[in-house]
């Protein structure tokens, strides 16, 4: 219909984080090279709803949802979707933080980057890190992320960090999130702002756009349950300031549900497609 057609055309207009449908995916058996029909059907359902791309959340031992990078790309594209991005990370050990030598972890990242490139990814996003005990450890993490981002860029990908609420705590006397924004190189590290978690952390996304313009290439559009239902996230003001943020892509993520999962992700997309303040595309 006309409303849904706004989500089509540009191949990267509306992404969904596959963690949103984890309860379905977790029941799917993709092992031994056999593609469970439930998995294929789910991807096609998402495409039929009006989603145009996916963000993975299951990279492990060189595979995505037990599929090789090439097979995952093929499965997604066969369903009429595109592969945009993926959540994965490798946290530094106590020994690496103490020594400042994270070369072993960088070896892991080299393989990780190669696998994501083979899967057709544009972005790799680190979805989590613990709150460091010292500012020195946080500084080491920023240097680590800069190096990962540099290696991603050399392979034609971009590297970013996704927040929750704990990044708004202070490490010594510095707000962790602000310190990360100020000590990572914009050339190598972008930030995937999770709008809901910024609000839950008692902060204003728009204030961050104005303080650090252009750093937030992807929005994780999330709410307490279905997108737009709680009224606690000021989506109107957020999207009116999206240009300042520097956003290129929107990724819907639904972590909690008040209706069945498939209905929940569809209702959430409908909100984004119908909201007058959400542009049909942010891709440049």
Predicted feature residues:
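Histidine-centered active-site/metal-ligand motif
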Residues: 1, 87, 162-164, 186, ...
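Single conserved hydrophobic/aromatic residue that forms the stacking wall/gate
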Residues: 1-12
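Histidine-acidic metal/acid-base catalytic patches
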Residues: 10-32, 36-50, 172-193, 197-284
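Acidic-and-aromatic substrate-binding clefts and catalytic sites of carbohydrate-active enzymes
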Residues: 23-26, 56-68, 90-106, 130-139, ...
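Catalytic domains of carbohydrate-active enzymes, especially glycoside hydrolases
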Residues: 36-59, 116-122
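Acidic (Asp/Glu)-rich catalytic clusters
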Residues: 43-48, 64-85, 108-120, 143-154, ...
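Active-site acidic/histidine proton-transfer and metal-coordination neighborhood
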Residues: 75, 82, 93-190, 262, ...
């Amino acid at each position: 219909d006309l409303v849904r057609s706004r989500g089509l055309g540009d191949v990267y207009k509306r992404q969904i984080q596959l963690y949103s449908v984890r309860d379905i995916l977790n029941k799917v058996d993709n092992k031994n090279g056999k593609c469970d029909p439930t998995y294929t059907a789910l991807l096609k359902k998402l495409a039929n709803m009006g989603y145009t791309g996916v963000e993975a959340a299951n990279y492990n031992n060189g595979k995505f949802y037990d599929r090789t990078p090439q097979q995952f790309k093929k499965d997604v594209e066969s369903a009429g979707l595109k592969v945009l991005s993926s959540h994965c990370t490798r946290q530094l050990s106590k020994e690496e933080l103490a020594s400042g030598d994270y070369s072993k972890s960088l070896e892991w990242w080299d393989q990780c980057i190669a696998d994501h490139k083979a899967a057709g990814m544009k972005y790799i996003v680190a979805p989590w890190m613990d709150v460091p005990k010292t500012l020195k450890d946080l500084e080491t993490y920023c240097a680590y992320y800069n190096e990962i981002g540099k290696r991603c860029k050399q392979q034609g990908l971009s590297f970013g960090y996704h927040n929750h609420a704990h990044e708004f705590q202070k490490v010594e006397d510095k707000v962790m999130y602000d310190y990360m924004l100020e000590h990572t190189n914009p050339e190598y590290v972008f930030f995937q702002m999770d709008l809901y978690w910024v609000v839950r952390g008692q902060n204003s996304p728009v204030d961050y756009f104005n303080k650090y313009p252009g750093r937030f290439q992807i929005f994780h559009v999330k709410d307490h349950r279905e997108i737009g239902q709680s009224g606690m996230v000021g989506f109107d003001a957020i999207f009116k300031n999206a240009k300042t943020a520097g956003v290129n892509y929107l990724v819907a993520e639904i972590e909690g549900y008040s209706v069945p999962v498939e209905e929940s992700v569809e209702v959430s997309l409908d909100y984004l497609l119908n909201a007058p303040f959400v542009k049909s595309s942010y891709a440049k």
